[in-house]
Amino acid sequence: MKTVAQIVAQNDWQNPVVFQRNRVGGHSPHHGYKTLEDALHNANAQKYLLNGEWDFCLFDAPEQVPESLLAATLSAEERAKWQSIVVPSNWQLKGYDKPIYCNVKYPFPVNPPIVPSENPTGCYRTTFSVTSAQLSQRNHIVFEGVNSAFHLWCNGEYVGYSQDSRLPAEFDISNLLVEGENRLAAMVIRWSDGSYLEDQDMWWLSGIFRDVSLITKPRQHIQDVFVTPTLDACYRDATVSVRTSIKAQLRCKVGIQLFDGDTTVTEQIVTGTNNKRVDEKGGWDDVVFQTLEVKEPKHWTAETPYLYRIVVSLIDDSGNVIDREAYNVGFRNVEMKNGQLLVNGKAVLIRGVNRHEHHQVKGHAINEDDMLEDIKLLKQNNFNAVRTAHYPNHPRWYELCDEYGLYVVDEANIETHGMFPMGRLSRDPLWAGAYMARFTQMVERDKNHPSIIIWSLGNECGHGPTHDAMYGWAKSFDPSRPVQYEGGGADTTATDIIAPMYARVDTDVEDDAVPKWAIKKWLSLPGENRPVILCEYAHAMGNSLGSFDEYWKAFKDYPRLQGGFIWDWVDQGLTKHTDSGDAFWAYGGDFGDTDNDRQFCINGLLFPDRTPHPHLFEAKYCQQHLSFSLTEETDKWQLSVKSDYLFRHTDNELLRWQVLENGKPIIEGECPIYVAPQQAQTVSIAPEINFKAGALYHLNIDVVLANDCAWAKAGHVIDTAQLALANKSGLIPFVSTANVANENAESGVTVKAENTTLLVSVKNNVFSFNSESGLLTSWLHEDSEMLSAPLEDNFFRAPLDNDIGVSEVDNPDPNAWESRWRRAGIGKWDRICTSVDVEQSTFDVRITSLFEYHYNDKLIAATKWVYTINHQAALTVEVEVLLDDSLPPMPRIGLQAAVPAPRSNEQERMRVTWQGLGPFENYPDRKAAARFGEHSLSIADLQTHYIFPTDNGLRSDCKQLNISGLRVNGQFCFSVSEYGQVQLDTAKHTSDLMPQDCVFVYIDHAHMGVGGDDSWSPSTHKAFLIEEKCYRYSVTFCAKV
């Protein structure tokens, strides 16, 4: 019996050569089905979950753990120190210790394999019962995930040790069990030398966070099954190769049966001990090799995830089944040919995303419902692939990917991003065993999943001979799949795929360590013929994904550019509460973790509760499988629907169309579509339209599900498009001016000066101008104030994450947009009105104000405002802007106003309608998915509450805006907010924001793009920068009648 003190003295958690003791080697998951029916339907596995309430006590270090951890009973004094904790869970989210978020840097001094002596250690105790029938069999305890290392005892006897937080730790405890109650005790150590291999841009959380189970198998049992289905060269017929490892002292047979549903397709029984394979070391009497021939099976792809079921049985001489395992089988080939990645002979386009296992409350302890929610959202938003960034996922995840249809890059739990150099441990032979175990154990566990089409050696740990060894082993063990690895430059000898990070479409990125060529350039490098699939791209941090459509244009134009994986799926925010009880999503530093990387974990397509960021709609649109083009004829339109599906027919889709006139629907229809893979169908649309002179016409297209499917309900929108229609009226709208003079005379436009105020009155409106400030300070319409603040120039936006880059509060990046803007004082310029002139004509009043802007005693900008108020009480503002040559590209060119905040009973005033792009937030470089129309939303819904507050809510290409009784006409972008830019700029969380007593309205002539190729360098493309020094624009305001 090994005491706690003896185990602690071994110091295994600081020895890179010791990453396990007594752990069972990797193998396919065990189920031990008793009946064929159970095997076919994955029911009643001989697997007993030990999840639930366990006893728990946290110590500051392993050395503090008492021997009473192993005691059968605890004294009252000892028992008082223990509480209960739910398993699985992360103890930091149950009130113990604190979460830490880091991206690159380690949360402890870097001195491998040494970790801090202050090393939180969680001790767990539980009991479980075993029957006499179980005692006669083989019993293994399996911990699916423990962070980061742990020692285990059963009934006071030492069991073993394990590292690798993301793979099963399985131990044979058959000889330690007794009939009736049995005791388990685990000592879980937060920091181990294994932590140096798990520096993965996520929260550092600890504990038993995945399932714990007892698996009971016969003494003579199936140990491992490797199923390899292979289609022939014509992708018609197939073979299924099955390698079965058995633990049997008696003469046994192995039977394999392939089922399609409950129907047997083919089967075979082989005598195990007479089917030896011989190599230089002799025969393999514990391994049986079998092959099944299958005629014209249905294929598995992400589009058509058809599954068969193979049942493997261990049979004794009497014909009795001793043990039985079963696995899903998908017939698909993965090949590398002519510089492309092929699935079943077709070059796939990876519509992928990187996904961390994360829950806003439970942290890393996710369950099947959480996984299923993600699977359905991925399918609903046109994703076909997932990279398990950056570790093997929960085993149920792969089963769901098999069932629902997602391609998977399965990634080993290895990242040493914070090491310098990054590849230091990858070149150290002391760490080679740990590297190899993490990779091989993953492959052994997951090898039978058809969804896994690529193995990944890990992430961001440089390149060394260990990677070459891992690559060589993978190609030998499983030649049916390619291997990818980005480390060392994305194109080393250890990868079959060029897998760069954040490479741009046309621009090379300077990098001191490794080159980051433009993806188009990578294709043309001498001697290079591998496909390019971005393992990470389009960094979705906050308000991001600008120019995402440029990637997809390139992917579709260049056959060897085969897509990529967006970073990343979900914001890794954790739910926290203010002192007053208000919930908000926390990021690095919010739990007292002083060494952190702030909000760099907030870079998902979804908020932590799985509601979408606006940029998810852009990704969905760019990745959709159908495209549309229109040919006009005399009395109808021919709509061509082209399919990019490689394998499936559109047999469950309805095409709904709608004609818009000036943004409003006037006629609509629908029809089913049946498009073959990579083919097109023409649909005739013959709407009766009475075209009006000067009107704008658009055709909206939605392709929706006709019936429910596994991942969405009927009516779910899959693909969208908007096509402009030519106005066939051929007429120019006629505007009569015959009665203008009389109307003006009757309206009585008057100008009156009162001290420093100029009052312009017309109809039921009074406009007040300050003759010193040059600003419109008040607008009364029927005695109601329209403005809460003057109209004025606006050049500032609350910086986005992409504007801030890698800047820290005390260490700003001088190249970041935010730093350039702050050096230029944008948002803090001193304004001086140099003149105000009034001109009254027969039809209107014109007030001209000239402004100068100074910063640090330097003239930095000048603007000219011409306010024109006509006889209809319409206010037209014409603005000229002149910027100093020293200024950087501007965040925006426009004006701002404020209107009274609506009261809760003023429902109509709480809604905003506009004619322009929408309905969701869109920016000049992220608007491909938005559609022109007349949209209406509440003021609250027009805002996007990013976890780290920034500018948000823009709507582009607008012609009209109606808000709070005010109408704006022109050509502009706009946003509406309950929070001013200063508040958005200074707030760190949504809980910091307090609605003000007005609603801010921002009208932009030009607004800089959001960027998003990455978030640490200026990534807004040149076409979406505001670089000119002179601008002129106009908008017209009027009271909405």
Curated annotation (Swiss-Prot):
Keywords tagged on the record: Glycosidase, Hydrolase, Magnesium, Metal-binding, Sodium
UniProt binding sites for Mg(2+) 2: N596
Keyword Hydrolase among record annotations: yes
List of residues binding substrate: N103, D201, E460, E536, Y537, A538, H539, N603, W1016
Positions annotated to bind Na(+): D201, F600, N603
One Gene Ontology cellular component annotation held by this UniProt entry: beta-galactosidase complex
Cofactor note text: Binds 2 magnesium ions per monomer. Binds 1 sodium ion per monomer.
InterPro entries xrefs: B-gal_small/dom_5, Bact_Beta-galactosidase, Beta-gal/glucu_dom_sf, Gal_mutarotase_sf_dom, Galactose-bd-like_sf, GH-type_carb-bd, Glyco_hydro_2, Glyco_hydro_2_AS
Superkingdom of origin organism: Bacteria
Residues the record marks as site: Transition state stabilizer: H356, H390
Cofactor dependency: Mg(2+); Na(+)
PROSITE patterns tied to this protein: GLYCOSYL_HYDROL_F2_1 (PS00719), GLYCOSYL_HYDROL_F2_2 (PS00608)
Any GO molecular function: beta-galactosidase activity
Residues involved in Mg(2+) 1 binding: E415, H417, E460
Presence of keyword Metal-binding: yes
EC number per UniProt: 3.2.1.23
Catalytic-site annotation from UniProt: E460, E536
PANTHER family: BETA-GALACTOSIDASE
Summary of subunit composition and partner proteins: Homotetramer.
Family: Belongs to the glycosyl hydrolase 2 family.
NCBIfam families: PRK09525.1
Protein name: Beta-galactosidase
Organism this protein belongs to: Alteromonas mediterranea (strain DSM 17117 / CIP 110805 / LMG 28347 / Deep ecotype)
UniProt gene name: lacZ
